[in-house]
Swiss-Prot record:
Biased composition (Gly residues): 448-468
Residues annotated to bind ATP: 64-71
Gene designation: DYNC1LI1
Major subcellular location class: cytoplasm
Lineage: Eukaryota, Metazoa, Chordata, Craniata, Vertebrata
Keywords: ATP-binding, Centromere, Chromosome, Cytoplasm, Cytoskeleton, Dynein, Endosome, Kinetochore, Membrane, Microtubule, Motor protein, Nucleotide-binding, Phosphoprotein, Transport
Post-translational modification: Phosphorylated.
Family: Belongs to the dynein light intermediate chain family.
The protein's name: Cytoplasmic dynein 1 light intermediate chain 1
Composition-biased stretches (Basic and acidic residues): 490-499
Protein purpose: Acts as one of several non-catalytic accessory components of the cytoplasmic dynein 1 complex that are thought to be involved in linking dynein to cargos and to adapter proteins that regulate dynein function. Cytoplasmic dynein 1 acts as a motor for the intracellular retrograde motility of vesicles and organelles along microtubules. May play a role in binding dynein to membranous organelles or chromosomes. May regulate the movement of peripheral sorting endosomes along microtubule tracks toward the microtubule organizing center/centrosome, generating the endosomal recycling compartment.
Example of a GO MF term: dynein heavy chain binding
Length: 515
């Protein structure tokens, strides 16, 4: 019994040991399984995180005319106040940050020079293996709207020509074109209650898009499919007010311009954004649209067509009917009018800049005048004054006929008589004229018929002598010189002098006879 009991006891101990060994093996196997599961979880998480990580190698290519504001636009998006413009092709970048996964990357930005001479540099910006990761941005200067359509057509043809040179396989190119068409058709206008911060696209949104009804494309939609997204950015929209004031642009002109640009965007499946770096308008909108197209962030900003200087039309929203609404406001323009004939370049106004005249110092000016006066020869202190009295109208006063008849018989002043000194003053000149007049009366010849003898010795009898003469006053001897005007003026002044001094004074005998 005891042996049995020991044996049983032994047997019992051996059985329990076997059970313990089995459980230990199970635990070891379970730990190995847990370890494998842990590593598999870590690997799957890393692989999932790598798949959800923001991709690198995305790029934006800007094309447009010189001075359109391409570098200024990217500098404003970066938040850089001072930036330097390059030549040929500039390289910049945009920081892209995913707030949900705390991940960030850089989006390459290349800006091509506005001169077509540099279009060969596109081979460094658009390669065959990276074309699907590229977004084209066509920049239009709205301060010069008459260049808008030519600029868009020119740079779009440059891109098309370069893509054709890449010789991408037809299957791959067709897949890119179909993706662009699908994105255009699957656009859904966001509601009013959209989130403010961008988030990654989730599967539920994708499933909703798959279940949504896809509408067919219009006749003029995506007729020029490049296979990559295109954005048309109109810069310097703050110049719209300047165009209204200086060039008489009206709302219908801006609607006409917008309608033509939107038709172009329909052909290429492009979005349209009006911006202003000066007024910081829609700058953040451009950045959000870029990261939505390249990195898949949902974009929840609705279209804006009411504000003429802040228009935003995402790709897939527009169609021909919506563009036709703009035509309803046309008064002088028509929808079928040519863009070049309706939006013309205004004539260039030549501004004449007058030279600024700097006033010199008074003392310097006076010294110059003094030196000029010193170089000039000494001139007369006064000039001979015309003694003939004038009426207020400025015409000489006609002397009395009686005085004229007396003067007609007076002989001219001899050549050797005293002349007026030019250096005399005005008063001295008048006295000289009077002296010459009386000297001529004293030196007259007598005895000739019709001559001075009929006048008498005094000027007062001139009237009688004039009336007693048989010859008319106009009858003169051949060779007789005309009577001096100064003598006539002096006689007229002497005859009127009593009236000017005292209106109540009695008339002189000469005036009585003359009257």
């Amino acid at each position: 019994m005891a042996a049995v009991g020991r044996a049983g006891s032994f047997g019992s101990s051996s059985a329990s040991g076997a059970a313990n060994n089995a459980s230990a093996e199970l635990r070891a196997g379970g730990e190995e399984d847990d370890g494998q599961n842990l590593w598999s979880c870590i690997l799957s998480e890393v692989s999932t995180r790598s798949r959800s990580k923001l991709p690198s190698g995305k790029s934006v290519l800007l094309l447009g005319e010189d001075g359109a504001g391409k570098t200024s636009l990217i500098g404003k998006i970066q938040g850089i106040e001072e930036y330097k413009k390059g030549r040929g092709m500039e390289y910049l970048y945009l920081n892209v940050h995913d707030e949900d996964r705390d991940d960030q990357t850089r989006c390459n930005v290349r800006i091509l020079d506005g001169d077509l001479y540099h279009k060969g540099l596109l081979k460094f910006a658009m390669e065959a293996n990276s074309l699907k990761d590229t977004l084209i941005m066509l920049v239009v200067d709205m301060s010069r709207p008459w260049t808008a359509m030519d600029s868009l057509q020119k740079w779009a043809s440059v891109v098309r020509e370069h893509i054709d040179k890449l010789k991408i396989p037809p299957e791959e190119m067709k897949e890119m074109e179909q993706k662009l068409v699908r994105d255009f058709q699957e656009y859904v206008e966001p509601g009013e209650d959209f989130p403010a911060s961008p988030q990654r696209r989730n599967t539920s949104l994708q499933e909703d898009k798959d279940d949504s009804v896809i509408l067919p494309l219009g006749a003029d939609t995506l007729t020029c499919n490049l296979g990559i997204p295109v954005v048309v950015v109109c810069t310097k929209c703050d110049a719209i007010s300047v165009l209204e004031k200086e060039h008489d642009y009206r709302d219908e002109h801006f609607d006409f311009i917008q309608s033509h640009i939107r038709r172009f965007c329909l052909q290429y499946g492009a979005a349209l954004i009006y911006t202003s770096v000066k007024e910081n308008k829609n700058i953040d909108l451009v950045y959000k649209y870029i990261v939505q197209k390249l990195y898949g962030f949902p974009f929840n900003v609705p279209a804006v067509v009411v504000e003429k200087d802040a228009v935003f039309i995402p790709a897939g929203w527009d169609n021909d009917k919506k563009i036709g609404i703009l035509h309803e406001n046309f008064q002088t323009l028509k929808a079928e009018d040519s863009f070049e004939d309706s939006i013309r370049k205004p004539p260039v106004r030549k501004f004449v800049h007058e030279k600024e005249i700097v006033a010199e110092d008074d003392q310097v000016f006076l010294m110059k005048q003094q030196s000029q006066l010193a170089k000039q020869p000494p001139t007369a202190a006064g000039r001979p004054v015309d003694a003939s009295p004038r009426v207020p109208g400025g015409s000489p006063r006609t002397p009395n006929r009686s005085v004229t008849s007396n003067v007609a018989s007076v002989t001219p002043i001899p050549a050797g008589s005293k002349k007026i000194d030019p250096n005399m003053k005005a008063g001295a000149t008048s006295e000289g004229v009077l002296a010459n007049f009386f000297n001529s009366l004293l030196s007259k010849k007598t005895g000739s018929p019709g001559g001075p003898g009929g006048v008498g010795g005094s000027p007062g009898g001139g009237s009688a002598g004039g009336t007693g003469s048989n010859l008319p006053p106009s009858a003169k001897k051949s060779g007789q010189k005309p009577v001096l005007t100064d003598v006539q003026a002096e006689l007229d002044r002497i005859s009127r002098k009593p009236e000017m001094v005292s209106p109540t004074s009695p008339t002189s005998p000469t005036e009585g006879e003359a009257s």
